[in-house]
Amino acid sequence: MTTATTAAARANRGSQTHGRSPEELRELVSHWGAELELAPAETIIEWAAATFGEKFCVTSSMADAVLSHLVSSVVPGIDVVFLDTGYHFAETIGTRDAVAATLPVNLLSITPVQSVAEQDAAWGKDLYKTDPDQCCALRKVAPLAEALSGYEAWATGLRRAETKNRVIAPVLGWDAKKGKVKVSPLARWSD
């Protein structure tokens, strides 16, 4: 199932109920991080689903469908958040559509407030070339922050093998900017 949403009109699961405080969430990371560090990806996902319930989602760039497939096998019906920046290749959109059609997930295709044409009119053509930071803020950072607002934790497909900056990425971490628990069940996976 695919749900297309815009930044102006989003309704996340659980956004009407009060969740844990940032201190409580950080305590969960502190308590469980080391214990889950060597756990299989499925165990990490099971823990996150049991701990956060409907306040747990997955973000996916659709570079592949591994994480969506893995999480949906453990937590059928989970929300999978995809940022449709307006700049994706057709293959990426095809993967998104295949995930929505073949996996038991609730795919949320999130779009920025402005279309690419509206952004070009407001900021000039090809903002990603002239001011990539502003472009990312408008097309990725702000929409993701809003999309995650109703959740306490989210799973990412981050892997330590991807870059040297991610070599020490924990499977369970605290994202202070987002005020959320970041779950990386694939962190220990290699190429």
Regions found by a protein language model. Give the residues of each.
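Nucleotide-activated chemistry modules centered on ATP-dependent adenylation/adenylyltransferase
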Residues: 2-191
